[in-house]
Amino acid sequence: MSLYDRLFKPRRYTLPNGAVAEEKRSRAPLVILIVLALGALSVHITGFDFGVLVKKGSKFFDILAAMFPPNTGYLSKIWQPLWDTIKMSFLGSFIGAVLAIPFAVAAASNIVTNRVVVFIVRLFLSLVRTLPTLVCALIATYIFGLGTMAGTCAIAVFTFAYVGKQLFEIIETVDMGPYEAMEALGATRLQAFTTAVFPQVLPTYLSVSLFCLEGNVRYASILGYVGAGGLGLIMNEKIGWREYDSLGMILIVLFVAVMVIEAISHALRKKLT
C-alpha cells in the first residue's frame, strides 16, 4: 500500500453478498495542490506580475495596429531574404535528414546488437537534441561567419537530432521477419536492412522529414536575430527602427510562404500514409 493510501484510507463498501470492496481515494486533490504549489513558486522566482501584464499588454495591440496597412513599397526588398530563408530550411532539412539515417540505424536495438554502441549513439542524439536552434546558429556564426551558412548548419543539426530519434524508434517497431530471412540467405546486415527494413520505414521517414521541414521554415525566419541571415535579419532591423508597417509586410509574406509550404507538405504526407 502506498503512503497516500495509508494517509487517506480507501473507502470500504460491503456488498450484498457480504464481500468487502475498497475504493481508493482520488489522487486529483494531491495533483492539484502540487501544481498550485509549483505555480506559486514559479511566480515568486520569476517575479511574474499579472498587473504589469494587463497594463503593458495593450502595447501589443498598439504595435499590431501600426503594422497595418503594411508598407507594400517594401515588398521588393523581402524576396531575397525570403528566398534565403527557404533555402536554409530545405538544405538544412535535407542534410539533417540524410545524416540521421546511419545514426538511427546504429541506435536501433533490433539492428545493432552491441548495447554499448546503441547507448552511446542514443546519448549523442539526446545531447544534440537539447541544443536550441538559436544556440546552434550562434555557434555556427562564430565558426562560419555571418550569413545563411550558419543558419543552414543550425537547421541541419536540429533536423538530424529530431529525425534521428524518430527514425530509430520507428525502426524498432518493424517486422523483423524479412530481415532475418535475408540474413539466413547469406546477406550482410547492410544488405538485409536496405532490402527488408528500410522499405518498411521509408514512408514514415519521409513524412517525419517533411513535418520537420514545416517547422524549420518558421525557425529559419528568426535565425537572423543571431546573424544567420534570412528574414530574421530584416525583421530585427525593422523592429529596431520601429518601422512596423514594413514589419507587417514581412510577416504577411512569411505567413503566406509558411501556409503554402505546409499545404504542400500536408498533401505529400497524406500520399505517403
Name each region found by the language model.
Residues 125-159:
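Generic hydrophobic transmembrane alpha-helix motif, especially the helices
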Residues 210, 248-273:
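C-terminal transmembrane helix and the adjacent membrane-cytosol boundary/short C-terminal tail
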Residues 93-101, 105, 109, 134, ...:
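Hydrophobic positions within alpha-helical transmembrane segments of bacterial inner-membrane proteins
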Residues 79-87, 121-128, 210, 214, ...:
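Alpha-helical membrane-interface segments at transmembrane helix boundaries
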Residues 103-137, 166-169:
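Cytoplasmic-entry segments and transmembrane alpha-helices of multi-pass inner-membrane transporters
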Residues 142, 217-254, 273:
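Glycine-rich helix-loop "coupling/hinge" segments at transmembrane-helix boundaries
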Residues 1-94, 101, 106:
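N-terminal, non-cleaved signal-anchor transmembrane helix
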Residues 146-197, 203-212, 263-266:
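Membrane-cytosol interface at the C-terminal ends of specific transmembrane alpha-helices
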